[in-house]
Amino acid sequence: MDQKQLQALVEQISIRVFGKPFRHTAFFNPRLRTTGGRYMLQTHNIELNKKHYEQFGEEELIAIIKHELCHYHLHLEGKGYRHRDRDFRELLQKVGAPRYCRPLARNTKAPKTIYTYICTSCGLTYRRKRRINIDRYVCGRCRSKLKLS
């Protein structure tokens, strides 16, 4: 789905579900990580997370659009547009929009390598995330050389 298709979809949902036009811009924001979308109060634009569309499909995207359009229309009408406001919760139920979006599958990072250094004299061990120059650093207890194990 590209920008024009997304804009047309948001405008269509706004007319069909809310009976009011959407006169601003809706677009995919690649910087969004944990949220499905957001409504910008200053510009009245709606930003959506493309990863939700790719992972869960168009149904989930439509649900997120409905949620953000609830924020949009209530804010423009001067009513309570925040999650905690009664107007917002009632409109969510009326249009069948979810209160929260489904969580994305996390990309787990590979565990970082832990470097273990052992003192050649007293045997004290040092565990570090970063590699150190063993020619420059010595044991803090006995001042002997360190060895990477």
Curated annotation (Swiss-Prot):
Residues annotated as domain SprT-like: 6-147
GO cellular component, as recorded: cytoplasm
Entry keyword annotation includes Transport: no
Cofactor(s) needed for function: Zn(2+)
Pfam family, one: SprT-like
Lineage: Bacteria, Bacillati, Bacillota, Bacilli, Bacillales
Family affiliation: Belongs to the SprT family.
Name of the molecule in the record: Protein SprT-like
Subcellular location as annotated: Cytoplasm
Active site: 68
InterPro entries: SprT-like_domain (IPR006640), SprT_Zn_ribbon (IPR035240), Uncharacterised_SprT-like (IPR023524)
GO terms (BP aspect): response to stress
Binding site for Zn(2+): 67, 71
SMART domains for this protein: SprT
Organism: Geobacillus kaustophilus (strain HTA426)
GO MF: zinc ion binding
Cofactor binding note: Binds 1 zinc ion.
This protein's UniProt keywords: Cytoplasm, Metal-binding, Zinc
